[in-house]
Amino acid sequence: MAELEAVADDLDALIDDLDYLPGHFHLEMQLNFEPRSPAPQRARDLKLQREGLRQELQLAAAPQRPAVRHLLGAFAFYLEELDEARECFLEVAHEHPGNLNAWANLAHVYGRLGQEEEEEACAARLADLMGLAEEPEAAGDPQLRAARCLAEQGYAHGFDVGCASPEERARGLAAGIALYDKALGYGQQIPMEEKRGWYFTMATLYIRLDGIFLELGSEEQKRLPAFNRTLALLRQVLKSEDPRHRALAWCYLGMLLERKDTFSTTPMGVHDCGYSGTDPLDCFGKAIEIAKNQPPILNRLAKIFYFLGKQDMAIGTCNMALDVLRDPELNWQAYCTRAKIHIRAYLHDLKRAKMGLGGMPDRNHLACAKADLEEVVRVCPGFKAYLDIGQVYYYMGVDAVQELLAVDEAALNQALVFLAKAGESELGATLPELQLLRGKCLRIKGEDANAAACFKRAVELDDAGSSHTDGFGCLLEALLAQWSQAQLSDGELGREVDAWLRRAQDKYPAARLRQELQRVWRGHTDEVLGLARALVAQGRPALVRLLFETMEREGEGASAPRDRRAVSF
């Protein structure tokens, strides 16, 4: 026993002396920490992130593919798909026998599987590659292996799962950048083209970090050094031989030059890098020019333009991709992105119409989105396509003023059919967006009890800290509708409102919840006053006080931040 303890102490001392530690399962990422969310939500988030990574793997340059495969293996591990995780790491080890993370991650998986001999063999191979064996046999430079190991770990921080706040996401991105810096210190002899791939990922992490700083209202001096460095990194990436990196670097440069106006004076990095007179639109134009014959790159650019709110540019880029490759089976991404742009345009106009700031939204947007999504559903159906086309049919079925009246019963029924298909998939069944849409369809059809059940499920599935309070607001409206139609008694309504308001307080930011309650109260004043009387009669004055305090604070709430799932490009 004493001998084993001595060996363990020696191992701990050795690890403490190391400047870096291979593998992904020790990294300080939320992925590796005890989950905060319930198991179904965590599994959903892991699978959604994994789906995005699989698409990334198809586009990634060869030197970056091991980093993507390591993450796919880590996600499979935490989804209890241990055989899949092992295969991911074995694939890297076979293609790149000197990859440190592959052997470290394999050792971790074998340990979990209880295969001690394989675990020890991986550990021995790892020690040899790191130059820690008594008689090292591995050829090659351990410094280069260390550099690539650290770069792969830095890449992983850009795809963390489970961050509960912007501050947590910022810390993770900063940790990823620090690992890349460390990798550059070890990797003096790394080929320049491979380094440019690192610079590209670093610039991406920096841009996301700056976006968080903007969201948090951070001081200029906190943003400035990183902003200037990002410009310098992108200038290096523009020399890359990889057209994808070059095109995206021009696009990111355009984004940064647009952000320079958020500083009181132009950041010095703009002048140092020679971009003093550069117009952001010229940068976007150069990105499109580089990608003009390559649909995968055009599709990525279109997505970025979509997230930036540049809808005309996004539509044009999608059209270019479809001019090159119209087959929806091979280029479904362009159809999906173009449909999303039309849906967003319709929703933007609908919101303005509800506020009395514009006329009726153009329903041609819905027709265009429907046509694109029908092409996708025909050749490669999936829960996302079903959800999107279900959303389109919902808006085709309701009025274009307040979403209160059915104008096309057949469209509403078709929406429910597509949403049911989306819900058949394991992932689709865990999406709050799907339950919210189902509830809205059922509410318009007059099925308030069924609608309320869907809205409850949407609230249950929402992440803690989510800004999407729509499901809770719709639930309150459905409960009030049932009560006004005598489908719920005063006591039942009071208990339901009490229980779900407490749950909402635990889940949503206070300011955002207040805004949602204000919206419901403004639209249903008579019902709310009736609810208040019923609650007083039930001896629930504290709940009444909370409701009326909410109404009195109208206008205090800050604008809602975007949800985590919507900000990643």
From Swiss-Prot:
TPR repeat residue numbers: 66-99, 101-133, 203-237, 260-294, 295-328, 383-418, 432-465
SMART domains: TPR
Presence of keyword Repeat: yes
Top-rank taxon: Eukaryota
SUPFAM superfamilies: TPR-like
Swiss-Prot/TrEMBL keywords: Repeat, TPR repeat
Disulfides per UniProt: none
Keyword Repeat annotated: yes
InterPro entries registered for this protein in UniProt: TPR-like_helical_dom_sf, TPR_rpt, TTC22
Protein's UniProt name: Tetratricopeptide repeat protein 22
Organism: Homo sapiens (Human)
Organism classification: Eukaryota, Metazoa, Chordata, Craniata, Vertebrata
Record gene name: TTC22
